[in-house]
Amino acid sequence: MGRIGKKAMAIALVSAVMVTPLNVCATVENQEQQQVTQGAEDIAVIDDAQETVAADEAQADEAAAITVEGRETAEESSASIPEGILMEKNNVDIAEGQGYSLDQEAGAKYVKAMTQGTIILSYKSTSENGIQSLFSVGNSTAGNQDRHFHIYITNSGGIGIELRNTDGVFNYTLDRPASVRALYKGERVFNTVALKADAANKQCRLFANGELLATLDKDAFKFISDITGVDNVTLGGTKRQGKIAYPFGGTIGDIKVYSNALSDEELIQATGVTTYGENIFYAGDVTESNYFRIPSLLTLSTGTVISAADARYGGTHDSKSKINIAFAKSTDGGNTWSEPTLPLKFDDYIAKNIDWPRDSVGKNVQIQGSASYIDPVLLEDKLTKRIFLFADLMPAGIGSSNASVGSGFKEVNGKKYLKLRWHKDAGRAYDYTIREKGVIYNDATNQPTEFRVDGEYNLYQHDTNLTCKQYDYNFSGNNLIESKTDVDVNMNIFYKNSVFKAFPTNYLAMRYSDDEGASWSDLDIVSSFKPEVSKFLVVGPGIGKQISTGENAGRLLVPLYSKSSAELGFMYSDDHGDNWTYVEADNLTGGATAEAQIVEMPDGSLKTYLRTGSNCIAEVTSIDGGETWSDRVPLQGISTTSYGTQLSVINYSQPIDGKPAIILSSPNATNGRKNGKIWIGLVNDTGNTGIDKYSVEWKYSYAVDTPQMGYSYSCLAELPDGQVGLLYEKYDSWSRNELHLKDILKFEKYSISELTGQASGN
């Protein structure tokens, strides 16, 4: 079975068990208040409608009469609704605020009386309104503004439905943020969406662009026939008290309304006629994870393209959680990808597909006891063809926020060893160390014990491997239950039930592969250099860098950040990764997340671009191979939030406009992780010396999507054919409203002509 076939099957399997109630109590107005949008027109329409609620007695009497008549008409029609397609319409252009009536279409009376069914439509929006109704059915008379059904989109990529018969009767909502696209390759594009209202299963499901997005289960199932006084079917808006609310502008390519509930497989196929980007890692793949974050993408000197990402099992939460590192590769320039593997993983908690709740309480729940890996970095030594995979290693129940101060190592006779605590020892004494050949020593006696660890830090007593019970995790309401199973797994020093326990701080983990990821070395903990005053020292996710020219040619570098005597730092190796040296790049102690990426200038000097807590990206320069760094210089023309976002920057191998070039990817907004841009910077030799020898002219910028669309962590790579590969999070990963979204890690390709063709100078 091909990769696409396996993905479709995986989606179908995950769909079969997906039960995710979302925002059941929230009206569209509530959702609008949660968004930062440009929808002032929408709000004005809603306010006008609410003011009209205070209608006089005559208007109320008239509305009541129409309501009774509408109910009788609906009851008569519902008894005779035919099977199959009730309505079909194609190529409808809609001016914003005008709407388009379908009341005269054949089948409209049946649509008004639907007790269940399926609605499939394609659209292209040219509007920036915050909320835009694509299709609606409702009661448009005075005093009945809360009696309607509609399918809507938001200008931040969300899709949803609202089914209301005034809040006192019923109000059902279902939505999924970051689900649809507005702009692709510089053009406004069509999306295909679908709603299935399934009375037999008491369930509504939303689909878009080949993916099942969200499910709402309601024992008291309702649909259009349950709305009192339905009098209109409308495209491009919702008629509320005689006015068009939630106006859409653009084109409805086609709409089909069915009286029956089509299958999930049919709707995945029907909506899959429009897709943008590819999921290298996706819910239901062999990793058994539903959620992926933190992209890494690298083209090797052989032309193979490799990728890595966090496979997050406990929703999209950071550590502490259960997180493994997924890896995949492409041997045809990113056209197809291998099945993922998990070169960095722990087994203390089961790996399984579980839908994490997104309600206001459940979305905050985290797995408490698992060990985890987080934030991959890929790097190739082009001289040896060896690839390295780095990540932060977090022992059981540890994340950056609760990591203990210290390195986790102890110096014995001038050498540093990983220190351990015997689980029965009183207090917090770490009186044991892992010495040569993995043997555990009692430091008080300086004698070996009968215990040792293997290359994965699994424990042995004499020659018998020790085991512990694996944990499972399941929800009971909004409570997460973590419980032991009957499954035995190898006992590991990073697990909570180990007899020897590692110090509860973060570590830097490394593996290498000499066969492009087919097999991997033993696990190496390389962070013995972590300062003892440091709470955490972690990688800047993305890729590392090898210097290609100058006196430091061949040196390997990986960006790091910390919260002790420096925010930004680096580790480097001059012996092909056998040994690593840590250097601090500043003396800042504010604790800003200084995630950084490195590029090389023509003479072998380095520039690093980093996330800051100052609404900007900063640049620092090194002329000694990364051992010392200049002060930070804010990058002009790119704005970020106060908390910042990881960025990606790479060298491009060919001149652009006759000059060396670098390419950078980042959000460009101060009010959220959104408005993703790709910039091309031309490198100029200033004629100066030292750190001022080169300047970068950010000549071109390219919009990945429209300004309100989410865009978070990203990684760029120059592909073998010269195109630029982009692996990125197509959502706002900081927003609490966008937690725990599936299949938001997208891979796309862009040519240099595309990136320069529409761009404007900064």
Swiss-Prot record:
Q: Which UniProt keywords apply?
A: Glycosidase, Hydrolase, Lyase, Repeat, Secreted, Signal
Keyword Signal in annotation: yes
The enzyme's E.C. designation: 4.2.2.15
* Location(s) in or outside the cell: Secreted, Extracellular space
* GO biological process assignments: ganglioside catabolic process; oligosaccharide catabolic process
Q: Which cysteines are joined by disulfide bonds?
A: none
Q: Which SUPFAM superfamilies match?
A: Concanavalin A-like lectins/glucanases, Sialidases
Homology family: Belongs to the glycosyl hydrolase 33 family.
This one is known as Anhydrosialidase
Q: Which organism is it from?
A: Macrobdella decora (North American leech)
Biological classification of the source: Eukaryota, Metazoa, Spiralia, Lophotrochozoa, Annelida
